[in-house]
A protein has these predicted regions:
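Concave beta-strand-loop units of leucine-rich repeat
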Residues: 2-104, 108-239
Length: 239
Protein backbone atom coordinates (compact mmCIF):
# COMPACT_ATOMS: atom_id res chain seq x y z
CA UNK A 1 0.00 0.00 0.00
CA UNK A 2 1.07 3.55 -0.69
CA UNK A 3 0.91 5.26 2.71
CA UNK A 4 1.57 8.76 1.41
CA UNK A 5 -1.22 11.34 1.83
CA UNK A 6 -3.02 8.92 4.13
CA UNK A 7 -5.49 11.49 5.45
CA UNK A 8 -5.88 13.88 2.54
CA UNK A 9 -6.62 11.05 0.11
CA UNK A 10 -8.92 9.34 2.63
CA UNK A 11 -7.12 6.01 2.60
CA UNK A 12 -8.31 5.07 6.10
CA UNK A 13 -11.48 2.94 6.37
CA UNK A 14 -13.64 5.63 8.06
CA UNK A 15 -12.27 9.02 7.00
CA UNK A 16 -11.38 11.30 8.62
CA UNK A 17 -11.40 8.98 11.67
CA UNK A 18 -8.17 7.09 11.09
CA UNK A 19 -8.48 5.09 14.32
CA UNK A 20 -11.76 3.46 13.27
CA UNK A 21 -12.52 0.60 10.92
CA UNK A 22 -10.59 -2.33 9.51
CA UNK A 23 -7.84 -1.89 6.95
CA UNK A 24 -8.12 -3.97 3.80
CA UNK A 25 -6.25 -7.23 4.26
CA UNK A 26 -5.97 -6.84 8.05
CA UNK A 27 -5.07 -10.07 9.88
CA UNK A 28 -5.81 -10.72 13.57
CA UNK A 29 -6.53 -13.51 16.04
CA UNK A 30 -3.07 -15.13 16.17
CA UNK A 31 -1.94 -15.25 19.81
CA UNK A 32 1.09 -17.33 18.90
CA UNK A 33 2.88 -14.90 16.59
CA UNK A 34 4.86 -17.69 14.98
CA UNK A 35 1.54 -18.66 13.35
CA UNK A 36 1.00 -15.34 11.55
CA UNK A 37 0.37 -16.34 7.91
CA UNK A 38 3.06 -15.74 5.34
CA UNK A 39 2.18 -12.76 3.17
CA UNK A 40 0.55 -10.80 6.00
CA UNK A 41 1.03 -7.08 5.40
CA UNK A 42 -1.34 -5.62 7.99
CA UNK A 43 -1.34 -7.20 11.45
CA UNK A 44 -3.75 -6.31 14.26
CA UNK A 45 -2.76 -7.20 17.84
CA UNK A 46 -5.47 -5.84 20.14
CA UNK A 47 -5.14 -6.28 23.89
CA UNK A 48 -7.16 -9.36 24.92
CA UNK A 49 -9.89 -9.06 27.53
CA UNK A 50 -8.66 -9.99 31.02
CA UNK A 51 -11.30 -12.66 31.45
CA UNK A 52 -9.93 -14.58 28.45
CA UNK A 53 -6.48 -14.93 30.10
CA UNK A 54 -4.97 -14.84 26.62
CA UNK A 55 -1.63 -13.23 25.77
CA UNK A 56 0.68 -12.99 22.78
CA UNK A 57 3.69 -15.27 22.58
CA UNK A 58 6.75 -15.66 20.35
CA UNK A 59 7.22 -11.97 19.56
CA UNK A 60 10.63 -12.76 18.13
CA UNK A 61 8.93 -14.74 15.37
CA UNK A 62 8.09 -11.37 13.79
CA UNK A 63 11.68 -10.16 13.84
CA UNK A 64 13.05 -9.09 10.42
CA UNK A 65 9.74 -9.85 8.69
CA UNK A 66 10.00 -7.92 5.42
CA UNK A 67 6.33 -8.32 4.44
CA UNK A 68 4.58 -6.51 7.30
CA UNK A 69 3.83 -2.86 6.49
CA UNK A 70 1.31 -2.01 9.21
CA UNK A 71 0.67 -3.03 12.82
CA UNK A 72 -2.13 -2.14 15.23
CA UNK A 73 -1.33 -2.53 18.93
CA UNK A 74 -3.31 -2.28 22.13
CA UNK A 75 -0.13 -1.97 24.19
CA UNK A 76 3.47 -1.06 23.48
CA UNK A 77 6.67 -1.41 25.50
CA UNK A 78 10.42 -1.46 24.84
CA UNK A 79 10.43 -5.17 24.02
CA UNK A 80 7.80 -4.72 21.33
CA UNK A 81 9.51 -1.61 19.97
CA UNK A 82 12.72 -3.62 19.65
CA UNK A 83 10.94 -6.23 17.53
CA UNK A 84 9.11 -3.64 15.43
CA UNK A 85 12.35 -1.78 14.76
CA UNK A 86 13.63 -4.86 12.93
CA UNK A 87 10.79 -4.76 10.37
CA UNK A 88 12.38 -3.13 7.31
CA UNK A 89 9.10 -2.16 5.64
CA UNK A 90 7.01 -1.03 8.62
CA UNK A 91 5.25 2.16 7.52
CA UNK A 92 2.12 2.33 9.70
CA UNK A 93 1.62 1.95 13.44
CA UNK A 94 -1.58 2.38 15.41
CA UNK A 95 -1.53 2.42 19.23
CA UNK A 96 -4.87 2.39 21.00
CA UNK A 97 -4.73 1.85 24.73
CA UNK A 98 -6.28 3.43 27.83
CA UNK A 99 -4.18 1.57 30.41
CA UNK A 100 -0.65 2.88 29.83
CA UNK A 101 0.82 5.69 31.93
CA UNK A 102 3.68 6.27 29.50
CA UNK A 103 4.97 5.21 26.10
CA UNK A 104 8.66 4.47 25.46
CA UNK A 105 10.64 6.44 22.91
CA UNK A 106 9.55 5.46 19.39
CA UNK A 107 12.78 6.70 17.80
CA UNK A 108 13.96 3.17 16.84
CA UNK A 109 11.04 2.94 14.38
CA UNK A 110 12.99 4.74 11.68
CA UNK A 111 10.86 3.63 8.71
CA UNK A 112 7.55 4.78 10.20
CA UNK A 113 5.49 7.12 7.98
CA UNK A 114 2.02 7.01 9.58
CA UNK A 115 1.37 7.02 13.33
CA UNK A 116 -2.16 6.79 14.76
CA UNK A 117 -2.66 7.34 18.50
CA UNK A 118 -6.11 6.89 20.04
CA UNK A 119 -7.74 6.45 23.46
CA UNK A 120 -4.45 6.96 25.32
CA UNK A 121 -6.25 8.60 28.19
CA UNK A 122 -3.60 8.52 30.94
CA UNK A 123 -0.64 10.06 29.14
CA UNK A 124 -0.01 13.79 29.46
CA UNK A 125 3.03 14.29 27.21
CA UNK A 126 4.23 13.15 23.79
CA UNK A 127 8.00 13.28 24.25
CA UNK A 128 8.11 9.76 22.79
CA UNK A 129 7.46 11.25 19.33
CA UNK A 130 10.73 13.13 19.11
CA UNK A 131 13.15 12.20 16.33
CA UNK A 132 10.66 10.31 14.16
CA UNK A 133 12.36 11.92 11.19
CA UNK A 134 10.52 10.00 8.45
CA UNK A 135 7.03 10.50 9.87
CA UNK A 136 4.64 12.01 7.30
CA UNK A 137 1.25 11.57 9.01
CA UNK A 138 0.44 11.97 12.70
CA UNK A 139 -3.09 11.35 13.98
CA UNK A 140 -3.84 12.03 17.65
CA UNK A 141 -7.33 11.41 19.00
CA UNK A 142 -8.52 11.40 22.61
CA UNK A 143 -5.25 11.98 24.43
CA UNK A 144 -7.38 13.61 27.08
CA UNK A 145 -4.53 15.02 29.17
CA UNK A 146 -2.43 16.41 26.34
CA UNK A 147 -1.43 19.97 27.23
CA UNK A 148 1.92 20.72 25.62
CA UNK A 149 2.36 19.32 22.13
CA UNK A 150 5.65 21.13 21.43
CA UNK A 151 7.51 17.83 20.65
CA UNK A 152 5.57 17.84 17.37
CA UNK A 153 7.65 20.84 16.27
CA UNK A 154 10.65 18.51 15.85
CA UNK A 155 8.84 16.48 13.18
CA UNK A 156 10.12 18.70 10.40
CA UNK A 157 8.99 16.40 7.59
CA UNK A 158 5.40 16.08 8.80
CA UNK A 159 2.85 16.61 6.02
CA UNK A 160 -0.41 15.66 7.74
CA UNK A 161 -1.53 16.34 11.30
CA UNK A 162 -4.83 15.51 13.01
CA UNK A 163 -5.28 16.75 16.59
CA UNK A 164 -8.40 16.09 18.64
CA UNK A 165 -8.73 15.51 22.38
CA UNK A 166 -12.42 15.80 23.00
CA UNK A 167 -14.03 12.63 21.72
CA UNK A 168 -17.80 12.58 21.99
CA UNK A 169 -17.79 15.02 24.90
CA UNK A 170 -16.66 18.10 23.00
CA UNK A 171 -13.21 19.61 22.47
CA UNK A 172 -11.64 18.48 25.74
CA UNK A 173 -9.08 20.32 27.83
CA UNK A 174 -7.27 23.30 26.26
CA UNK A 175 -3.69 22.94 25.07
CA UNK A 176 -0.90 25.33 26.00
CA UNK A 177 -0.29 26.97 22.64
CA UNK A 178 -0.67 26.68 18.88
CA UNK A 179 2.91 27.93 18.39
CA UNK A 180 4.56 24.51 17.72
CA UNK A 181 2.61 24.34 14.45
CA UNK A 182 4.58 27.28 13.05
CA UNK A 183 7.65 25.07 12.53
CA UNK A 184 5.88 22.38 10.50
CA UNK A 185 6.74 24.00 7.19
CA UNK A 186 5.97 20.88 5.10
CA UNK A 187 2.44 20.58 6.48
CA UNK A 188 -0.28 20.20 3.83
CA UNK A 189 -3.17 18.81 5.91
CA UNK A 190 -4.24 20.05 9.34
CA UNK A 191 -7.20 19.19 11.53
CA UNK A 192 -7.00 21.27 14.71
CA UNK A 193 -9.89 20.07 16.86
CA UNK A 194 -8.64 21.47 20.16
CA UNK A 195 -8.87 24.76 22.04
CA UNK A 196 -6.02 26.87 23.42
CA UNK A 197 -5.90 27.97 27.04
CA UNK A 198 -7.08 31.45 28.04
CA UNK A 199 -9.33 31.49 24.98
CA UNK A 200 -6.39 32.40 22.80
CA UNK A 201 -7.62 32.43 19.20
CA UNK A 202 -4.44 33.88 17.66
CA UNK A 203 -3.87 32.07 14.36
CA UNK A 204 -0.53 33.71 13.49
CA UNK A 205 1.26 30.35 13.88
CA UNK A 206 -0.72 29.01 10.93
CA UNK A 207 0.41 31.79 8.62
CA UNK A 208 3.85 30.17 8.31
CA UNK A 209 2.36 27.06 6.70
CA UNK A 210 2.62 28.08 3.06
CA UNK A 211 2.12 24.51 1.79
CA UNK A 212 -1.16 24.03 3.66
CA UNK A 213 -3.96 22.81 1.39
CA UNK A 214 -6.53 21.43 3.84
CA UNK A 215 -7.53 23.05 7.12
CA UNK A 216 -10.33 22.10 9.47
CA UNK A 217 -10.46 24.11 12.67
CA UNK A 218 -13.02 25.14 15.28
CA UNK A 219 -15.16 28.10 14.10
CA UNK A 220 -14.04 30.22 17.06
CA UNK A 221 -10.58 30.52 15.47
CA UNK A 222 -12.06 32.00 12.29
CA UNK A 223 -13.76 35.03 13.82
CA UNK A 224 -12.63 38.68 13.84
CA UNK A 225 -11.13 38.56 10.37
CA UNK A 226 -9.03 35.45 10.93
CA UNK A 227 -10.70 33.51 8.12
CA UNK A 228 -9.97 36.28 5.63
CA UNK A 229 -6.37 36.49 6.84
CA UNK A 230 -5.86 32.76 6.29
CA UNK A 231 -7.26 32.95 2.77
CA UNK A 232 -4.96 35.86 1.98
CA UNK A 233 -1.76 34.42 3.44
CA UNK A 234 -2.18 30.76 2.50
CA UNK A 235 -2.80 30.70 -1.27
CA UNK A 236 -2.93 26.89 -1.59
CA UNK A 237 -5.64 26.50 1.03
CA UNK A 238 -8.76 24.75 -0.25
CA UNK A 239 -11.57 25.05 2.29
Amino acid sequence: MDWNNYLSEEKCPSPPNAHLGVLEGEVWGHWDLSQVPKGTKILSLPTPLKRTKLSYSNWNALRNNDEIEAIKLGYIDEERIDVLSSLPNLKYLQIHCNSQDNIPDLFPLKTLQVLVLAYITRIDNIEFLKRLSNLKTLYICDLNHLYDFSPIAELSGLQELFLSNGGMSGVGKPVKSMEPLSRLLELEYLHFGVTVENRNYDISSLLHLKRLKHLSILPRFLKKGNEEKLKEMLPLLNW
